[in-house]
Structure formats: structure tokens, C-alpha cells
Amino acid sequence: MKKRFLVFLSLILLILPISIVFSHEGEENEFMLDHSELYPISQLSAVTYGSILFGILIVIIIFFHKRMNNLTKKIVYFLIAAVASLVTIYLIITTLHLNVISLTKGPVHWHADFEIWVCDEEIKLAKPKSFLSNKQGVNLMHAHDDNRIHVEGVILNNKQSSLGAFFFAIGGSLSADGLKIPTNEGLVSAHDGDLCSEKPAKLYVFVNGNLIDNPAFYVISPYEKVPPGDRIKFVFTEKSIEEINPNIG
């Protein structure tokens, strides 16, 4: 019985790391919005796998404790303590490391209000699909169906708090000559030269009433309240710039 149990436990410990490695193969994140590429596994994965292993060990104790000798019991209890300790230490170390190497030496909480207009129609982002989350986007960069960009967490570089990162986070894209926005009706795509009112249209992006170039690279101002946080307006229209209202609201 002792040998079977130890073989079973060894298989679990061998299979678990292998599954972690394969679960991260092929992952790509243009803006690295979840910091997963910095560490062997993400914090969420560490908690998930640690919880699974912890649960397996608890089940083993519940169903097999009467058949275990003292040495086996000590091994199982040691593994339970080790799993809990290692996960906790991993979370502490990665959190401290992220804060030390971050751009601001700690987490941020910035906001910017926005509107998106395509051919005189205001475009609303697709509502969150997850029952457990009200975020349109990811933890670091998202909206809450409130026309407000939320930057919440640790940023490592300016790129992670750019407008390009926001559009990437919500499942769209932004460039100097166009944008793509996921909506409840599907993906809305508009690029310079597409028609509005049967006339060639162009993308304009205004920040606090001022026209900007290369909007994907624009970094959101570091403020929690709006104003002084940015008020950003995306306008795709056939109208001349003189005919456009550059302000939101």
C-alpha cells in the first residue's frame, strides 16, 4: 500500500509541472498586459495549481489516513505545508519584484474618459461576456461599460498604458489610420478611405480637445480623476476637421 501511494503521489508531482509548461506554450501578448512572460507561471496559475494539489492531498488524507503508516502521514502533511508555503512565497516574491521593476514603483489607478464615433454614430463596446467579471478588457487595462478607460495595477513601461494597449485589451486595434472595436453586433472596422455618407472618411483622435498624431502610442495621463485625467474622442468621419466637435459629452 505504501509503495502504491508513493507512486501515485510521484505521478501527480511529475504531471503537474508538465501541464504548466504546455499551458504556456504559444502564449503571445503584444503589450504584456498580464506580466505572464516575466515568470515561469503567472500568479493565477500558481494559486490554481497549488489549490488543486492541496485539494488532492486533503482528499488523500480523508480517504486513506487509516491505511497510512506514520511516515506516510508525515510526508503528506509535510507536502500540504510545503504547497501552501511555496505558493505564498511565490506570490510575495513576484509581487515585490513587479513593484520594484515597475515604472511607478507600485500599482497605479488611472482613468481617462472616451467616446468613439463612426460616421456620426456613437459606438459602444461589447458588454462583458464573463458572468464573473464586469470588465471590458483585462485586469490591467479595461472599461466597465462606462466609457472610461481604467488602468489598474502595475505597469512596467509606457506602452502598457497607451491607447493601443487599451484597444488590444478589449479585443480591437488602433492605428494612425483606423480602428477596430468589438461591439454587441460584431466587430466595427473603419480605416481611412472607407465611406461615410458616400464620401471618403478619415480617423481623427482628440485628447482634451487637441488633435493628436499616432494615437496608438499616446500614453494616458497619470490621474485617477477626470479631469484632470484625459478626455479622449475618436472620430471617424467624412467631415473636415473644422466641422468636428473635438470634445466629449
Locate the predicted segments by residue.
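Positively charged n-region of N-terminal signal peptides that target proteins for export
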Residues: M1-R4, K73
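Residue-level detector of intrinsically disordered/flexible regions characterized by low predicted structural confidence
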Residues: R4-F5, V47
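Alpha-helical transmembrane segments of integral membrane proteins
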Residues: L6-V7, Y77
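Bacterial N-terminal signal peptides
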Residues: L9-P17
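Ubiquitin-like/PB1-type beta-grasp interaction modules and other compact soluble beta-rich domains
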Residues: V21-G249
